[in-house]
Amino acid sequence: MNKIRVRYAPSPTGFLHIGNARTALFNYLFAKHHQGDFILRIEDTDLLRNVADGEASQLKNLRWLGIDWKEGPDINGPFGPYRQSERLTIYQKYAFELLEKNLAYRDFEKDKKNFAIRFKVPPNQTFTFCDLIRGKLTFLSKEIEDWVIIKSNGYPSYNFAASIDDHLMQISHIFRGEEHITNTPKQIMIYQSFNWSIPKFAHMTLILNQERKKLSKRDVNVCQFIQDYADLGYLPQSLFNFLSLLGFSPSSCKEILTPQEIISLFDVNRLNKSPAIFDKTKLDFFNNHYLRKTPIDDIVSFIKTKLDFFEVLPINNQKWLTKFILLFQERINYIKQLKDLYHHFFDKNTSLSEEVEQFLKKHDCALSVLTLFYHKLNLVVFEKEAINPIIAEIAQNMKINKKNLFVILRIGATHKMQGPSLALFLELLGKKQVLNNLSKIVELLKNQ
């Protein structure tokens, strides 16, 4: 097999979309599996759609995901430049060759001055290629009109520029979305016109939401861009793992895989023909798995980069913040959920729910239990190492169902029936707040 060279060629029109990230990742995995080259090329010839910082955001998001490239706009290589806007003379050269061969013609506008160059679609011809995922695909030339290769502004069309670049950059395989299938016969026309070898194509399936509809901005539960997930506190390794399984069924019996394991397992023969389903629940499961293994200091660093969002947290109290993260680390699916958990569990103005009041009414022992709990907590240094023995002592001495007892203690100290590890939670709430909570419940029970 000749040297494997693949490319990801985004347009700088905004942030890195989920679908494009999957395309980049599959190209990257294929190259790495075969010890080949992964190339980044910027297709910036659609001037009206290009946005400021579009290229920079693409590069930033790819690197965040863990995808690097051997050649690209920021890494010199032997086949540059790697921005199409810097290759205009190359496209014009090949367009004029086609004019000279009578395989293209000038299509003048009404002013008779400006013109586009159109490719002459050969009559009565069949274009067939073997897609690595879908098998044999055939197109008839009679179904394709003469198409523009150079626009009147001198810029190339997508299909023309991509074909020229893929040949000159020695691209051997092209992995892309199925929406590009209809572009393939036009690109084959260019290869055949110059007697160039045709790269192998693999058109990946669409990514659908759980209603089996194409992802759209109306999907409120699914963020569309990689940057959104980074901002929420999803980890790059979880996105890498999750995206790699959207349309790929590895031979491994497990789903949690390291990048190196995925590279080793990646096999074009195991790419799916049916659409991939974006399962947000599975992504959250993956991210929770990786968050559990993430050093606390890394989560603290993330929080400190989002001060405007986490302003409610006592950011400057490193000891408290570390314990707070430890308390909830195994419960969160992404880091920004910590803010919601803080509001839910540390809001000092919460009122008792009807469920809590009904529970207390059913347990006559609650008053004596919570009175004892108050007095014992009032005597100790407020750390979990001192609080845990008190809870254990009360549980041992009170002849009450243990499950109900712990709920009574939690309600008294936190005003909630459920929550994280009680002793550490109380330490973080602080002695003043916990004793105040207990006092309110004790008074309520006395007055019933």
Swiss-Prot record:
A cellular component term, taken from the record's GO annotations: cytosol
Annotated keywords: Aminoacyl-tRNA synthetase, ATP-binding, Cytoplasm, Ligase, Nucleotide-binding, Protein biosynthesis
Motif 'HIGH' region: where in chain: 10-20
Residue window of motif 'KMSKS' region: 214-218
Leading EC class: ligase
A GO term, aspect molecular function: tRNA binding
InterPro entries linked: aa-tRNA-synth_I_cd-bd, aa-tRNA-synth_I_codon-bd_sub2, aa-tRNA-synth_I_CS, aa_tRNA-synth_I_cd-bd_sf, Glu-tRNA-ligase_bac/mito, Glu/Gln-tRNA-synth, Glu/Gln-tRNA-synth_Ib_cat-dom, GluQ/Sye
EC number: 6.1.1.17
UniProt function note: Catalyzes the attachment of glutamate to tRNA(Glu) in a two-step reaction: glutamate is first activated by ATP to form Glu-AMP and then transferred to the acceptor end of tRNA(Glu).
Complex formation: Monomer.
Protein family per UniProt: Belongs to the class-I aminoacyl-tRNA synthetase family. Glutamate--tRNA ligase type 1 subfamily.
Listed NCBIfam families: gltX_bact (TIGR00464)
Protein name as annotated: Glutamate--tRNA ligase
Organism ancestry: Bacteria, Bacillati, Mycoplasmatota, Mollicutes, Acholeplasmatales
Gene: gltX
